[in-house]
Amino acid sequence: MKQSSPTYLKHHFLIAMPHMADPNFAQTVTYLVEHNEQGAMGLVINRPSGLNLAEVLEQLKPDALPPARCQHIDIYNGGPVQTDRGFVLHPSGLSYQSTLELGELAMSTSQDVLFAIAAGTGPEKSLISLGYAGWEAGQLEAELSDNAWLTCPADPAILFDLPAEERLSAAAARLGVNLSLLTAQAGHA
């Protein structure tokens, strides 16, 4: 019997099924930054925190007044792990003190990317979040087996160009799925 190699979902969206009971992930779409035999890491991309970049910058540099445009740049709840730590998804090409290249996207975790965005010299498109979603080895696979998530390849247009409230339905639509037509009951055939 041929052993199949595991399928990893790096650069995919996780779309929460309607029966998702965990309040951290109910009605969310999560971008998977990493997924391998050691586990997975992702950022929820459709949960604005109520904070904006100006408020974050005021905490980082209380003596400096952030540009007015920073009041219109939302900060997202990226997940329940390390909620005091910032993560910035952006198109690859620009590098900061701490940038992880992810192919066509990159993730920066150093403060310099925030100041560059504020100054207008940072990435044109970005998604800034506090916290991340993490899964231990085998945990995400078990959740997928339990039908907790749908998956599809990530689309930068959904990440960066759509309002937060449209991202979940747009990600599901990539699969031809209307989430409002799915039952809130999970099962196996």
UniProtKB/Swiss-Prot annotation:
Database matches in InterPro entries: AlgH-like
Annotated source species: Pseudomonas aeruginosa (strain UCBPP-PA14)
This protein's GO CC annotations: cytosol
Protein's recorded name: UPF0301 protein PA14_05290
Signal peptide feature range: none
Gene3D superfamilies linked to this entry: VC0467-like
Family of this protein: Belongs to the UPF0301 (AlgH) family.
PANTHER family documented for this protein: UNCHARACTERIZED PROTEIN YQGE (PTHR30327), UPF0301 PROTEIN YQGE (PTHR30327:SF1)
